[in-house]
Each structure stands twice: as C-alpha cells, then as structure tokens.
C-alpha cells in the first residue's frame, strides 16, 4: 500500500543526511497549508468534499498516475491529475503559481556555482503550466531522469 514513510522526502533525507550534504525545501509545510487558507471558503469546501467523495477510488487513481509517470507519459499524468479539477483558482494556487516560483528559483540558482538536485512532486512536472514549461519559457531545458 501507499505510505508517507515511503515518500520521496524520506528517501532523499535518508541519502543526504548520512553524507552531511546540505539540503533544504523549496517551501515549508506552513506555506503549503497556507495555500488552502488563501482560497475562498466555498472553493475550500468543494475541494474537501471532492477529496472525501474520491476516497473509494484513490488507490486506482494513484496506480494510474504512477503507471503514467513510470512510462514517462507526462501528458497522460497531467490528464489523470486534472480530470476532476473544476476549480481554476485551486490549480493556479496549488500548481501553476508554485511552478512559476520554483522556475524562477532554478533560473537564479543556475547563475551560482555548484550542483543542485531539485525534486518536486510529479504533478508539478506535467501539463502546460509544469515546471519544465516554466523553465522552457525562460530558455532553460530540463530533462526527465529515470
């Protein structure tokens, strides 16, 4: 089954900590929770109800998303992730604006010496507003690593 203990953050932390590699997050948990708080109350309620209503299908949906990502099918992943999304304000706040901010950070970081590894959730790597699309708009090419 799916478990937070098997998440990307935990896997990365397990690799960097013993090697004393510097690491940080692009965002804090408080910032992420604040994204919801900044949305209109009716949008928050609809989103909560959509999440609750979708619980019975979550494993099937996650399996489909993981399969699309493993195939390298970013557009298929974007379709699966956004098929139930009826709130443009939600998508803009949770995905597009954050992708734009991260792309700006990456662009700025490329002007500094050293190597940086950036990991973000798969939902940020698919669709028109993806991190890659935001980077491409700045003339930066990103490549998916298997």
Question: Model-derived features: where do they sit?
Answer:
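Hydrophobic, often amphipathic alpha-helical segments used for membrane interaction and targeting
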Residues: 1-111, 130-131
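C-terminal structured interaction module
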Residues: 115-146
């Amino acid at each position: 089954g799916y478990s937070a203990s098997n998440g990307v953050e935990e896997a990365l932390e397990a690799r960097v900590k013993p090697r004393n590699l510097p690491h940080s997050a692009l965002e804090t948990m408080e910032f992420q929770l604040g994204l919801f708080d900044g949305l209109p109350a009716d949008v928050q309620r609809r989103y909560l109800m959509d999440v609750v209503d979708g619980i019975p299908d979550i494993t099937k949906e996650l399996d489909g998303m993981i399969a699309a990502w493993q195939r390298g099918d970013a557009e298929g992943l974007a379709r699966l992730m956004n098929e139930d999304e009826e709130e443009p304000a939600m998508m803009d706040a949770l995905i597009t604006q954050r992708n734009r901010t991260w792309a700006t950070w990456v662009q700025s970081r490329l002007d500094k010496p050293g190597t940086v590894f950036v990991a973000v959730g798969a939902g940020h790597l698919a669709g028109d507003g993806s991190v890659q699309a935001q980077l491409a708009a700045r003339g930066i090419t990103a490549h998916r690593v298997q």
